Amino acid sequence: MAKKKGENYDSDGGDDQDYDEEPNFDDPEGFVDDVSDEELLGDFLKQKPCESDGVENVIVVDNIPVVGPARFHKLQGVLEKLFKTAGTIVNIHYPKDDEENTRGYAFIEFKNPEMAEEAVKAFNNYRLDKSHTLLVNLFSDFQKYSDIPKEWSPPEPQPYKMQNDLYNFITEPDAQDQFCVIAESSPGAVQVQFWQNTQPEPVELLTRDRFTETYVKWSPLGTYIVTFHKQGVVIWGGSNFTKINKFPHSGTQYVDFSPCEQYLVTYGPNGQKIIIWDIRTGTEKRSFISDGTSNMSMFRWSHDDKYVARMGDNAIHVYETSTFYLLDKKSIKVQGIRNFSWSPTDNIIAYWMSEDLEAPARVTLLEIPRKNEIRNKNLFNVADCKIHWQKSGDYLCVKVDRYSKSKKDKKDADVKFLGMFYNFEIFHMREKDIPVDSVEVKETILAFAWEPVGSKFAIIHGDPASANVSFYEAKKGQEPTMLKKLEKKICSHLFWSPRGQFIVLANLQAGSFEFVDTNDFTIMKSGDHFRASEVEWDPTGRYVVTGTSGKVKEDHGYHIWSFQGKILKRVNLKNFILFLWRPRPPTLLSDEKQKEIRKNLKKYYAQFESKDRIRMTRASKELLEKRAKLREQFVEYRTKRVSEWEEQKYRRMQLRNNIDTDTLDADPDNVEEEIVEILVREDTTLLE
């Protein structure tokens, strides 16, 4: 026990007590601490006061209207209403001259520096009216601009840094696709494996432990893969998946790429910021404050990355990506808008608006940037609509949920719809005046899907326990015609091949699948994958993957099937999370060249079959060599174990009273056979 400071002890009679000396906590002489205060107290030091506190919260707004006392309050109200959208305003100061006229600029203080920065990004070069465009800067920028040297010195040339080949994955001679497999290696650690789908066995390209904290996502053309971390997200690319850029946005839950991969949108937790980034430079282009509701995929992109749009209250906000300002500096007013969607090939927006008093519901096609309404369709007794574009942009289908009558609930004032039936409004986008055809179905609609390449579409309708699958075709100048109706199918989802023609009818509750060729509607094969919850085609339409993720307790893993329904590989993987094929960019060949290749495809059959035979022969040889090597290893292992067993024979006999038990079973005279009968159950049957 250590002595207490200031406590006295009697030297006489205290000999029987043993007190330890107080330990010395001082650093030894010459000790140098290699850990900085920033590493130990980083979070605490962020709160340390500094000289710029208060100044960083202030912005300077130039080019505001010069007004007198009579119009000052109106100007004050306009500016406060405008800037409070960026954050909490603490104070506003308007410098005035001797006649109480404003001087054309103002100082605004916000609650924190983040709000001030948001105000600068949102309102710098903001057009207040025809004569005034606001110029907004941080007050702390004055020092930065005043320190600019008067004499310019040219920058020093930097050595050239070799860039990654981001497109090497599409140069594979046999067009074998890549895929990644995500699994949880340990709690809080996610492993990502990258594979090449070679035949007959896939080849592992790379494995990254702790590559991401949640999941990964491919960009639309397969150039990048994004990983999620506490501080933000990182994109990777190239043959070895090296880091390309990072985007700091704490707590990012979801990301979205623009179709041409020029921009990345990061979505923070609900109620927080949404940021649009330039992928190549890593700079922030524009940020928005979420309204607190679910904001996943709040922004929707045009096919060419020229525009991005989001839905507001009775309006569509369309931004030009060259400046990220509103198109024509104003929103598109649409009273009662419920949803909208871009065409996948043209700058056309399809939106629908709900019924309002005597006005019917309406579907409208809007051409951007001229904002011309190129087609309208009025709809009556509408409960809901779903917009489905065909991938080639040739057709648009609007699924309309209609009712015979409605009833308002007295308790919660909700409207209940009775006598439901369904219409499919088919817009022929490539024909003059965009004619519209209608297909009516009385039964409940469970699923709808367009053929990506072609003019067919499929629907699942009826009772989920015994549904029907109907296939229709939309031809130019004709109404949609039913091609085939498959009855009594237990399926819930439709998955078309990206190349068209083939479709998978899936029941994700039971894990059963049917592979259908829609040329003659033959069911090529049926199969099961117990508890499978995911289905994904590869980009070429040759393979299908079904997977069971961590949502179920056992049987995690994935199966690879051919497009004909033949199962090629079963992989059981503990803590399997996700399987993702790597997307491919669209072909550079023209439509005429593709038609020519299809026409002369028979010329290449012999070449393809020869390559397949060589590949299978090589694979068979490698497989035989692998088996022979494994057999040699087993024989070597068995020989060692037999030798050890023989060496231990003397010891075994000592333990067993010098009885050689190794040969007991070999001599039948040493074996006694005993038959034991056990009464399991006794039943009594009365005979009449």
From Swiss-Prot:
GO terms for biological process: formation of cytoplasmic translation initiation complex; regulation of translational initiation. InterPro entries: EIF3B, eIF3B_RRM, Nucleotide-bd_a/b_plait_sf, RBD_domain_sf, RRM_dom, TIF_beta_prop-like, WD40/YVTN_repeat-like_dom_sf. Keywords: Coiled coil, Cytoplasm, Initiation factor, Protein biosynthesis, Repeat, RNA-binding, WD repeat. It is found in: Cytoplasm. WD repeats lie at residues 208-246, 247-287, 291-329, 332-367, 440-482, 527-572. Residues 613-642 form a coiled coil. Belongs to the eIF-3 subunit B family. This is Eukaryotic translation initiation factor 3 subunit B. The gene is eIF3-S9.
